[in-house]
Swiss-Prot record:
Its EC number is 3.1.11.-. Keywords: Exonuclease, Hydrolase, Nuclease, Virion. It is found in: Virion. GO terms for biological process: nuclear-transcribed mRNA catabolic process. Disulfide bonds: none annotated. This is Putative 5'-3' exonuclease R528. The lineage of its organism: Viruses, Varidnaviria, Bamfordvirae, Nucleocytoviricota, Megaviricetes. It comes from Acanthamoeba polyphaga mimivirus. GO terms for molecular function: 5'-3' RNA exonuclease activity; RNA binding.
Amino acid sequence: MSEEYKKRILIQYENYLLQQDNYVYLATKNSVNWSRNKITPGTAFMNKLVNYLKSDQIQSLLNTNRQDMNIIITDMYEVGEGEKKIVNYVHKYLHNTSDTVMVYSPDADVILLCMLMPVSNLYMLRHNQETSKKFKRNIYDLINIKMLKNNISYYINNNPDFSRENFIVDNINYDLVCISTLFGNDFVPKIETINVKKGFQNIMDAYLKTLIELKERNTYLVRKVNGKFNLSLTFLRRVIKNLLPEENDYIKHNKLYNTYVTAGQIKNVFSYMEINSENIVSVYNEFMREYGDLKNLIKNNGNLTYFETNDQFMNSLKKSICIIMDDQCVNTSYLSNKDTIKLLRNYYIKTREFPRVNINLNTWSHSTDDRRHRNIIRENNYNKYQIEIYKFDKMLDEYYVKFNAQPLDLSRNKIEQFYETYFGIILLDKNKNLTEEANEIMRDYTEGLLWVFDYYFNDKTYVNRWYYQHEKAPLLTHLSMYLDGINHDYFNDLLSGLKKYRVKNIKNFFNPVEQLIYVSPMIPGIIKLLPSNYRSYITSDHLDPFLKTYFIDVEEIVDQLWDQKISDEIDCRSIPYLNKCIIKSIEKPSSSEDKLFLTAIRKVKPTATSHKRSKSIEPDF
């Protein structure tokens, strides 16, 4: 859809570009673009890449001076996510090994998966994109997983805001991996009122509070019994209840969160008071003024007594800065005020600067008139056409309105409307209890959370039919009401019932070519990536009636978007990227529709080429 819309923009700016020097129009129209769709399983490019990697030529090069190295290539024809294959391989062949194991991955989720691996000497190598960009050279982080787990457990057991504890290292790490995945994953929508990236400290605090509340019962969120991981309903209920104040604050001050980018962090930094729209600017400015005073005193060897005894300011400062010493961020929460100031002095002597605070009064940007976007446009010397493309990609100016990219209004009087709009239900009955249909929504989301838990902790299979059928997540308040109304047996039955979604016979599931067709709009750029027999069938007059209704008409959708000043077709509320927006005319296929799709597409008579590109087997680990 995005590329089709950009074609319209190019046509609109054709005359302008023709008037520019250096054949700008021709260079734009005929620019060399490499479609990312080519790296999708089922394409000719991926088939060639697999054959190339497995060729004698490459295998010989890989083994040069590495005769003892066992190189395993698992490709797209072996189903499964790459990280899942790594985890399963380690579990099967390296379980409790005394050897050192290192995993290389750009995916942050793999850090969590590494924390669950049964290996003592485990490291993860990760390319640090942000630092590499800053220093204009490749910089890698080497993460010692055992040290990471010990540091996390030390933080939990020695948190200065709570009593000193002795919770078990493995249990703490199981729990935090679980918490991290439940509140931030690619399988179910995030809960709108809980921002994992900008408010993870609140989640950590709620977890630690729950851990201490249930200490006498020796209860953790995750338990390992007879080699299988189980999720505690009791703990889950309690940790969600401990997060409800955060949700209530988000709802009460919804306008504030929808205005300031770091509102969640600001709330945490100044947790001793209630931050609202009226005081946020003055509180922040006063804090920054005091930080400026502290920096000047350190620079000039002034009297620091005021700051050494000012717990309120220093606690806020500790929460808002990261002091890097020896390439490590020092956790200042355990330090006294005097030691923190001493560390700041040492940092200044070493770098001649002070750490920046991680909070600011930046607002969510919706216009090219905002300073950040003005600077980008000026630095890149964009012409009018490029500015239009930039506005489109970032959903700025008229696109902000056209695509309904405003913040989602979750103020108190808009909650029921939220459920009506995104779930099509009435939330509460006359007694303020969840309606039957609302309970179904909560059940679906609970099943989703359990599926995510099972995926990370237990499930070693590769093919699964489960999916979350809604576009949004319910709010914690109503999820909590639902969990209070179910018993442990029902909860455990939901977890054990997930096995029914596992695909036992891979022949009954999508092969690479079928999956490419299933997830892609049948536009010319995609169709030409298919084997010739599929191309002929899809463009013929004999296309199966089901497929005629299944394939979306991208041009029709783009026509509507182009013509309407405010689209009734697309919903981008609180969605940062255009490709994640909700297209209302596109519904998620049901499992029965999946079967109809496979029946229809398998009418295509296979050829030698399509057969090669349609192979599908399971790894042996």
